[in-house]
Amino acid sequence: MSKLGKFFKGGGSSKSRAAPSPQEALVRLRETEEMLGKKQEYLENRIQREIALAKKHGTQNKRAALQALKRKKRFEKQLTQIDGTLSTIEFQREALENSHTNTEVLRNMGFAAKAMKSVHENMDLNKIDDLMQEITEQQDIAQEISEAFSQRVGFGDDFDEDELMAELEELEQEELNKKMTNIRLPNVPSSSLPAQPNRKPGMSSTARRSRAASSQRAEEEDDDIKQLAAWAT
């Protein structure tokens, strides 16, 4: 059995040790990534230093230059191994994060499903149908009430419009006849007026003005009679 197998076998024999939580495992992986990142930086610096030493010795100290190049190769090999390890750890961390996220999502969905089930247990489909039917009926009643309020209320006073118009015309005619009766017409003389003497050249100005005023009054009375006759017809 390989040493790696013995290591995992020995580690798994401890039943008292509880499995780590996803949060703890993620913390450990991030710490490992940080440590390997620092190791990468150290190796890259050492590689640059060994290259500088190899260039410095060059052909003057060939043995020292070769030793520097050998160390550079070892550091590059370690750096390659660390790159592979970091890739594996990064993949493992992302997978664990996804698993943890999926677990939390599943737990929350299960919690919500239980809550929904608890709510639905208190619901009866028959009661819901009855409630919706009752709501519909109440809405119909409210609509009928609104329509009833919007209609014209006559309180049973259904009269014939033509009959009312005829009665109104009769009242207007009676009022018109009453006004005609109250109007006093000018008295018409029963006998013919005496003939007026012809004006002589010697008629005074006072007599002429009196005659003109009498003639004007007679014309005004004739106009009033004509207006009353036209209004009566």
Swiss-Prot record:
Residues 154-233 are annotated as: Intramolecular interaction with N-terminus. Phosphorylated at Ser-210 by AURKB during cytokinesis: together with ZFYVE19/ANCHR, phosphorylated CHMP4C retains abscission-competent VPS4 (VPS4A and/or VPS4B) at the midbody ring until abscission checkpoint signaling is terminated at late cytokinesis. Expressed in heart, spleen and kidney. It is found in: Cytoplasm, Cytosol; Late endosome membrane; Midbody, Midbody ring. Changing residue 210 to A: Abolishes localization to the Flemming body and ability to delay abscission. Disulfide bonds: none annotated. Its overexpression strongly inhibits HIV-1 release. Belongs to the SNF7 family. Probable core component of the endosomal sorting required for transport complex III (ESCRT-III). ESCRT-III components are thought to multimerize to form a flat lattice on the perimeter membrane of the endosome. Several assembly forms of ESCRT-III may exist that interact and act sequentially. Self-associates. Interacts with CHMP2A. Interacts with CHMP4A. Interacts with CHMP4B. Interacts with CHMP6. Interacts with VPS4A. Interacts with PDCD6IP; the interaction is direct. This is Charged multivesicular body protein 4c. The lineage of its organism: Eukaryota, Metazoa, Chordata, Craniata, Vertebrata.
